[in-house]
């Protein structure tokens, strides 16, 4: 029987870690990682002493902010991540953290995960933007994932492993979250006129925009594919993190989100078409049915 889900980091003790992982852990020292690093989750590094165990692991628990927990629970974010590691992680075509423990109460959304500590890998500063060679590797990786489930991902939403990007829960929640963030940003930052023309009207446009993201052929979408959730290992091996927004929808969403969020504006203008063409070629070379890859519609 799996170890009980801890109510807080204070319950992540040596005994709990031993029960959860099967290791012989004699001491645990927990430290929160950063401030504002985990928005939907509280993220900790647990330093371990014992035998047959790594020196450190990452522990994820619900966020410390009750509002963030509420939003995450409504969107089934904790449920999605636990289900991903239990059912899909072994099949994705890139490296992910090894999961040592993952449980969620689907009624309360209380959850806990213990995963591999990948803190030694190379990170990318999303503010500066990802170098184009790294971006190409990231596009190749997401294309391979999309190809594997191209035209076949509706079943994942049907069984609750993912949520469709067109699910009614998104337009019920996202405009509220956006409005809160928009108010804070406009109070603190002077927005360009071009942004001010769009921002006040964006919330009302969310529903039709999201609906369009599920008008197939659908695939497995990461949902938050950007530099902050990507690492690079030895020989520039692609490593992808964070699967709380895993969804079913059109793969072009992941690509557009990545290009607009993870490379500089200059590189986006210069390489946008190249990256799109690379993604299309990746889909086809990895087995996505040619008759289901409409390049014109996806662009």
Annotate each PLM feature.
Residues 136, 281-299:
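Helix-rich C-terminal or lid/interface subdomains of diverse kinases
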Residues 83, 87, 245, 251-288:
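Active-site activation/catalytic loop segments of kinase-like enzymes and analogous catalytic loops
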Residues 92, 122, 146-153, 279, ...:
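A generic secondary-structure signal for well-formed alpha-helical elements
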Residues 2, 121-222, 234:
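ATP-dependent phospho-/nucleotidyl transfer catalytic cores
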Residues 37-48, 52-53, 57-58, 205-251:
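Active-site acidic catalytic loop and adjacent metal/ATP-binding pocket
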Residues 108-121:
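Conserved short submotifs of the Hanks-type protein kinase catalytic core
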Residues 1-110, 233-238:
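Conserved NTP-binding catalytic cores of kinases and kinase-like/nucleotidyltransferase enzymes
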Residues 67-71, 123-128, 241, 258-265:
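Glycine- and acidic
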């Amino acid at each position: 029987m799996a170890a009980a889900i801890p109510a807080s980091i204070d319950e992540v003790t040596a005994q709990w870690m031993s029960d959860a992982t099967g290791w012989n852990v004699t001491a645990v020292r927990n430290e929160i990682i950063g401030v504002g690093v985990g928005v939907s989750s509280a993220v900790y590094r647990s330093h371990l002493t014992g035998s047959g165990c790594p020196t450190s692991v990452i522990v994820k628990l619900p966020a410390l902010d009750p509002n963030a927990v509420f939003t995450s629970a409504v969107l089934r974010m904790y449920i999605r991540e636990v289900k991903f590691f239990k059912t899909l992680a072994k099949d994705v075509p890139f490296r992910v953290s090894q999961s040592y423990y993952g449980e969620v109460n689907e009624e309360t959304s209380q959850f806990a995960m213990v995963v591999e500590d990948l803190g030694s890998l190379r990170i990318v500063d999303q503010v500066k933007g990802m170098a184009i060679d790294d971006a190409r590797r990231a596009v190749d990786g997401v294309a391979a994932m999309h190809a594997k489930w191209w035209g076949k991902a509706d079943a994942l939403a049907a069984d609750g492993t993912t949520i469709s990007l067109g699910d009614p829960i998104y337009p019920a929640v996202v405009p509220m979250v956006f409005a809160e963030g928009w108010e804070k940003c406009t109070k603190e930052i002077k927005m360009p006129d071009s942004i001010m023309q769009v921002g006040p009207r964006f919330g009302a446009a969310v529903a039709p925009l999201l609906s369009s993201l599920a008008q197939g052929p659908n695939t497995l979408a990461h949902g938050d594919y950007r530099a902050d959730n990507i690492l690079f290992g030895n020989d520039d091996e692609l490593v992808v993190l964070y699967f709380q927004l895993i969804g079913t929808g059109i793969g072009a969403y992941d690509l557009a989100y990545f290009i607009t969020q993870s490379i500089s504006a200059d590189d986006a203008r210069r390489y946008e078409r190249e990256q799109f063409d690379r993604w299309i070629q990746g889909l086809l070379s990895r087995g996505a049915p040619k008759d289901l890859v409409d390049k014109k519609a996806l662009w």
